[in-house]
Amino acid sequence: MLNAFKLHKKNLFRINIDQSSLIKSIWIDIVNLTEEERRRIQNELGQNLSTSLDLEDIEASARFFEDKEGLHIHSFFFFADAEDHVGNSTVAFIIKNNILYTLRERDLPAFRLYRMRARNQTLKDGNAYEVLLDLFETKIEQLADEIENIYSDLETLSIIIMEGRKSNEYDNALSTLAELEDVGWKVRLCLMDTQRAINFLSKKKHIPYEQLDQAKGILHDIDSLLPHNESLFQKVNFLMQAAMGFINIEQNRIIKIFSVVSVIFLPPTLVASSYGMNFDFMPELKWPLGYPIAILEMILAGLAPYLYFRRKKWL
């Protein structure tokens, strides 16, 4: 799917690609590039786009470079699908002749948000670098929101873990903590990747001075978010250890109960087994009060250790 955007009085608006030419576009946004779209861009704009871009290559030399086809940046963008599966999807950015080309494999929240804002947002300088950096700013805002959401979820989990009384609450909390840790790592990877991309872009001599200041602002935002992201892992680790500790305490309590019960029933069992021995000479067997006395002896044998454990506060 191909979307093209042009400037009108420094306002970004989407054109009808079926009725308008792509010439003078400032942003060409493509989701799952087709051969037909590639040929049209080649014919109208003279830009050669590959239909088989290796978007997932994480080598810096392959993700950030400049050649005759323009300036190339491959950067991660965070997403969460309808089934709450999260991940980072790579977007390829190409800038040439003041046109920004974005090639991606899926719909991304940062792009949707930026398109909505662009309807009423005026570009200060009206160049492709500004659109690129605006997209990165939108991405950083989204990542900041994700960090805030994780903080909120951790606060809820903290209450559940510290006040929980049921084992299934701890099980669910551990599962959620693992998911939050995974989200945190993906956010961190996205932040670090963006930091590398902006550092690469800032070193280019042909980037306008105004966008250089904008890039520095993005780097400052990333530097402020990374420590917050790091503290999330510390919080997750603390809550995991706390949950595991409470689970161990509960398991030890159960084991303790079984141990005490087995000790309490051991003396009565000894008494019962003594009178269950099959010998010819056992005077108590012919005694009329032998059976009730044996039962009473078993009760006292079990009651004595129980009272002792209660006195020691082991129960």
Curated annotation (Swiss-Prot):
Alphabetical keyword list: Cell inner membrane, Cell membrane, Ion transport, Magnesium, Membrane, Transmembrane, Transmembrane helix, Transport
InterPro entries per the UniProt record, alphabetical: CorA_cytoplasmic_dom, CorA_MIT, CorA_TM1_TM2, Mg/Co-transport_prot_CorA, MgTranspt_CorA/ZnTranspt_ZntB
Protein name: Magnesium transport protein CorA
Subcellular location: Cell inner membrane
Subunit structure: Homopentamer. In the absence of Mg(2+), interactions between subunits are weakened, and dimers, trimers and tetramers can be observed in vitro.
SUPFAM superfamilies for this protein: CorA soluble domain-like (SSF143865), Magnesium transport protein CorA, transmembrane region (SSF144083)
Domain remark from Swiss-Prot or TrEMBL: The central ion permeation pathway is formed by the first transmembrane domain from each of the five subunits. Mg(2+) binding strengthens interactions between subunits and leads to the formation of a symmetrical homopentamer surrounding a closed ion permeation pathway. Low Mg(2+) concentrations trigger both a conformation change within each subunit and a loosening of the interactions between subunits. This results in an open ion conduction pathway. In addition, this results in a less symmetrical shape of the whole complex.
Bilayer topology term: Multi-pass membrane protein
CDD domains, per database record: EcCorA-like_1
Function text: Mediates influx of magnesium ions. Alternates between open and closed states. Activated by low cytoplasmic Mg(2+) levels. Inactive when cytoplasmic Mg(2+) levels are high.
Transmembrane intervals: 257-277, 289-309
Motif stretch (Probable selectivity filter): 276-278
Annotated catalysed reactions: Mg(2+)(in) = Mg(2+)(out)
Cellular component terms per the entry's GO annotation: plasma membrane
Any GO molecular function: nickel cation transmembrane transporter activity
UniProt record similarity statement: Belongs to the CorA metal ion transporter (MIT) (TC 1.A.35) family.
Site location (Essential for ion permeation): N252
